[in-house]
């Protein structure tokens, strides 16, 4: 738990050098094969950040994430830290500003350790379409970590960081969380600001937290959530933490989803449902009846918005430039052909 780390730092049982060094030793030992990061901050910079956090912890004036190392998906803008979207098109891009979620993390004392690998422009589900090479699952290097936030999921599973941020359009947080045996949340649309997210499908994409336990997930979510005047899609309602008792809680179970799930998945879900039922929850089967249209609708929206959003990367205004000269249509085609991958 992040509270335990903060307590150990405050009381001196954990010093900044050994604390940060333990993460970087794991990264040094395994990163060459896992490839969770695109950009990793120098260890000495991170140690200095932690030293400042320890001072604030001991003064009693500290944030909720004080001193905690966080991995950030590489489509979330971080001032002064390269942000590539896993693409040659943005290979050298260093944002001059922070995304709102990064501002909030920094304000609460969180420390960015690096930017994680991802499917190019978040279009993929295996983290294999990155210009920087594929990420592997730390539990089994022959397997995928899921995607498109596979680098964030892998970084958590390998204990390269304590918390992580991902983005989710059609499963890009939830899939890596499941594949890497960690936790991930796609927040309800509008609860987390998307300002500074390099999105490919604005109507669907959300930034969300990832962690190794529910307590830490809740803390990170509470930090990044909330209205933002720079994102008109955020909701103005104040988010409140509520205690929910399982006894008497009414839960819907999507029957049509269970019908198409594989046996191992059904087994795990049924185990959870039985546990909830034994705790006094009321389970009600729900059949939506229109799930056959969900995936086609998703692809129509996502691909339409992707074609619009990615049109700006032409090598003239934004993105990789081949340096070729000629008719503008030819130059656009050459730049985009060289800057984008096959996905």
Tell me the role of every PLM-derived stretch:
Residues 79-92, 158:
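DPxDG-like acidic metal-binding loop motif
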Residues 13-20, 51, 261-287, 314, ...:
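Acyltransferase
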């Amino acid at each position: 738990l992040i509270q335990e780390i903060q307590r150990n730092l405050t009381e001196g049982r954990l010093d900044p050098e050994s604390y940060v060094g333990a993460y970087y030793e794991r990264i040094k030992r395994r990163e060459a094969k896992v490839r969770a990061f695109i950009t990793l901050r120098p260890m000495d910079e991170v140690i200095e950040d932690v030293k400042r956090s320890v001072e604030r912890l001991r003064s009693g004036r500290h944030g909720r994430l004080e001193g905690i190392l966080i991995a950030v998906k590489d489509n979330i803008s971080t001032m002064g830290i390269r942000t590539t979207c896993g693409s040659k098109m943005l290979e050298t891009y260093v944002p001059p500003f922070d995304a709102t979620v990064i501002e909030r993390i920094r304000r609460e004392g969180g420390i960015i350790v690096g930017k994680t690998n991802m499917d190019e422009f978040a279009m993929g589900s295996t983290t294999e379409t990155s210009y920087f090479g594929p990420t592997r699952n730390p539990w089994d290097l022959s397997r995928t970590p899921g995607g498109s936030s596979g680098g964030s999921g892998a970084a958590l599973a390998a204990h390269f960081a304590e918390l992580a941020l991902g983005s989710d359009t059609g499963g890009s947080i939830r899939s890596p969380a499941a594949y890497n045996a960690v936790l991930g949340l796609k927040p309800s649309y509008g609860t987390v600001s998307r300002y500074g997210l390099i999105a490919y499908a604005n109507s669907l994409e959300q930034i969300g937290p990832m962690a190794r336990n529910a307590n830490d997930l809740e803390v990170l979510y509470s930090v990044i959530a909330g209205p933002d005047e720079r994102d008109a899609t955020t909701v103005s309602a104040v988010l409140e933490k509520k205690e929910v008792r399982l006894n008497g809680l009414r839960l819907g179970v999507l029957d049509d989803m269970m019908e198409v799930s594989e046996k191992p998945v059904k087994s795990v879900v049924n185990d959870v449902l039985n546990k909830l039922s034994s705790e006094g929850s009321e389970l009600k089967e729900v059949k939506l009846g229109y799930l056959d249209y969900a995936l086609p609708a998703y692809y129509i929206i996502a691909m339409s918005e992707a074609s619009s959003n990615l049109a700006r990367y032409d090598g003239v205004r934004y993105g990789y430039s081949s340096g070729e000269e000629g008719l503008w249509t030819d130059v656009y085609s050459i730049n985009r052909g060289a800057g984008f991958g096959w996905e």
